[in-house]
A protein has these predicted regions:
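Cleavable N-terminal export/targeting peptides
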Residues: 1-25
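Short glycine/proline- and aromatic-enriched beta-strand/turn motifs that initiate or cap beta-hairpins
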Residues: 19-60, 68
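Residues that define the transmembrane beta-barrel architecture of outer-membrane proteins
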Residues: 26-28, 34-36, 50, 65-69, ...
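Repeated loop/turn-to-beta-strand initiation elements of outer-membrane beta-barrel proteins
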Residues: 40, 49-52, 80-83, 124-127
Length: 158
């Protein structure tokens, strides 16, 4: 029952952010994420400094299957970009908070994420890369602290 409630809250959060991003109509990036998880990544800019990102990853093997989903609200800081005086590129730090859910064969996992990262993009190209470190606090089925890391590439549609 507890897992169902947490999963329902997670899905409601995603639907809320998808409605906000739909009204924005710009700044949607789709791409790949490697390592934590490995799968598909999406990022939707809400304004110049705030974005919502998410990822979906699958792990399939003969004896084990899992589906990984996360969503984060991110704040981007422009001070590094201003210090380096980059003319044709953007290098920004970001941090935020979010949730992750891992659906497994035997034990579903629900946790809090606190991503800290760096994003780089060229002003004349619709591509962006990112690198992030993520302290994670799993709260279900048992409390556990861990670190994850990921790199990725996104193509921006608008």
């Amino acid at each position: 029952m507890k897992k169902s409630i947490i999963t329902a809250l997670f899905c409601c959060t995603l639907l809320t952010f998808s409605q906000i991003s739909y009204a924005q109509q710009s700044g949607v990036g789709l791409g790949a994420i490697l390592n934590g998880p490995t799968g598909v990544s999406v990022k939707v800019w809400l304004n110049e400094d705030f974005a919502v990102d998410g990822a979906l990853g699958l792990q399939l093997s003969e004896n084990f299957q899992s589906v990984y989903i996360h969503s984060d609200v991110l704040y981007h800081n422009n001070s590094l970009n201003e210090e380096l005086n980059l003319n044709n590129a953007s290098l920004r730090t970001y941090y935020g908070a979010g949730l992750r859910v891992i659906f497994q064969d035997f034990n579903d996992v629900v946790g809090l994420r606190l991503p800290i990262g760096l994003t780089y993009s060229l002003t004349n190209a619709p591509l962006g890369t990112f690198f992030e470190l993520v302290p994670t606090f799993d709260i279900e089925p048992a409390f556990q602290f861990s670190f994850a890391g990921a790199i990725g590439l996104r193509y921006y549609l608008n």
